[in-house]
């Protein structure tokens, strides 16, 4: 995490220099940026710790609750009107997540709770990103995100201990992660800031597809019928909310 955060920070630092944009500290004291950064720190720390203990397919399924959480937060704190249909859909979506993780099962890992904490952090981050003023550039916000990601690695290092040196194969993967991660941060931040949340949200569900494929094919994880049913409930609820929002805003 530390190396990835530092590497990505240098990428954005270079892009900022190329655009002639100064690194300002004043945005760090903006309330919306502070909210976004707090969510980023919570999400990054908890998700990376969860990756060491929780199957990636489970992580992908739980993260799909983020659009549901955003809708709930918009209703509770941002004054958005959410009718009974969307409220019920939110409940169904969370029920689907419970079906997937199966908390009563003998194989349930309590570390799964870290993924829910990360989902809450992502929700806080996305809401904060939406509230950030247009006067703050996406590159600058992305630079802050990478610095926070490296800081999260330092925090985890204090608790876990131990530092390992990467070999040649890991170094290649690390460089690929820096490149792809930097692009992902830019595109994600830009989409959330400029796009309509109801349009952006459905694309989040592709993460579950990728995590399931990676978990089953690459990591040899097992997915049962109950987990697939839970995934269908969560995705179906999210897509219903998205469709309902489009209908109401038409």
Identify what each model region corresponds to.
Residues 106-131, 250:
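Glycine-/small-residue-enriched transmembrane alpha-helix faces in small-molecule transporters
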Residues 85-102, 226-245:
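Hydrophobic transmembrane alpha-helices of multi-pass small-molecule transport proteins
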């Amino acid at each position: 995490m530390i190396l990835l955060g530092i590497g990505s920070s240098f990428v954005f630092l270079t892009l900022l220099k190329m655009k002639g944009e100064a690194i300002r500290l004043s945005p760090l004291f903006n309330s919306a940026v502070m909210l976004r950064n707090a969510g980023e720190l919570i999400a990054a720390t908890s998700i990376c710790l969860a990756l060491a203990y929780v199957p990636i397919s489970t992580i992908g399924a739980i993260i799909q609750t983020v659009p549901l959480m955003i809708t709930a937060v918009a209703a509770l704190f941002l004054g958005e009107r959410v009718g009974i249909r969307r409220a019920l859909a939110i409940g169904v979506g969370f029920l689907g997540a419970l079906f997937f993780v199966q908390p009563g099962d003998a194989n349930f890992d309590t570390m799964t709770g870290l993924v829910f904490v990360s989902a809450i952090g992502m929700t806080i981050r996305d809401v904060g990103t939406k509230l950030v003023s247009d006067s703050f550039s996406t590159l600058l916000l992305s630079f802050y995100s990478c610095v926070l990601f490296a800081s999260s690695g330092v925090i985890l290092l204090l608790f876990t201990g131990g530092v390992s040196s990467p070999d040649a194969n890991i170094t290649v993967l690390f460089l690929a992660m820096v490149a792809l991660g930097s692009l992902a941060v830019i595109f994600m931040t830009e989409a959330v800031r400029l796009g309509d949340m109801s349009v952006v949200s459905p694309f989040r569900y592709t993460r579950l597809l990728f995590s399931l494929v990676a978990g089953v094919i690459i990591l040899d994880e097992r997915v049962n019928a109950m987990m697939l049913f839970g995934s269908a409930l969560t995705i179906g609820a999210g897509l219903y909310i998205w469709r309902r929002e489009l209908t109401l805003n038409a």
